[in-house]
């Protein structure tokens, strides 16, 4: 088993559970503040080796992955990984289905506009698709 594992349907998710899946959509939750991050990760990376024409398939760093958000990474560094739970929300067989489901959930969960009781953002996510930004939404309201 690996440190602070991913959970899927109340069970620890391991390599043998990957089967034919290409990637997953996940939620990382800060147990101290309840702040969340929704993202996606692929199980595989495809790289062209020097001097080769074909791409080779390699397992990605999905077991160690904690998202790409700088604010989330900073909180993990400050509080420690043990204060964050990692849940796989859905598994997908293609890159396109993985990306679509991530985007759908980001909008459905209102990650750019949802606030905690204290008025701070409920999600670490600060943008969707690099096109829609939390800061733009709140500027619009003021």
Question: Which residues make up each language-model segment?
Answer:
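Structure-specific nucleic-acid interaction/processing domains
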Residues: 1-142
């Amino acid at each position: 088993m690996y440190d602070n594992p991913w959970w899927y349907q109340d069970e620890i998710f391991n390599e043998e559970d990957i089967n034919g899946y290409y990637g997953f959509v996940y939620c990382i939750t800060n147990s101290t503040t309840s702040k969340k991050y929704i993202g996606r990760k692929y199980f595989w990376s495809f790289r062209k080796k020097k001097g080769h024409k074909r791409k080779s398939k390699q397992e990605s760093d999905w077991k160690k992955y904690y998202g790409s958000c700088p604010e989330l990474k900073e909180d993990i560094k400050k509080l420690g990984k043990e204060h964050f739970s990692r849940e796989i929300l859905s598994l997908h067989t293609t890159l396109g289905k993985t990306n679509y489901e991530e985007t759908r959930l980001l909008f459905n969960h209102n990650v750019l506009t949802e606030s905690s009781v204290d008025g701070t953002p409920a999600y670490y996510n600060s943008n969707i698709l690099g096109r829609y930004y939390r800061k733009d939404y709140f500027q619009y309201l003021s």
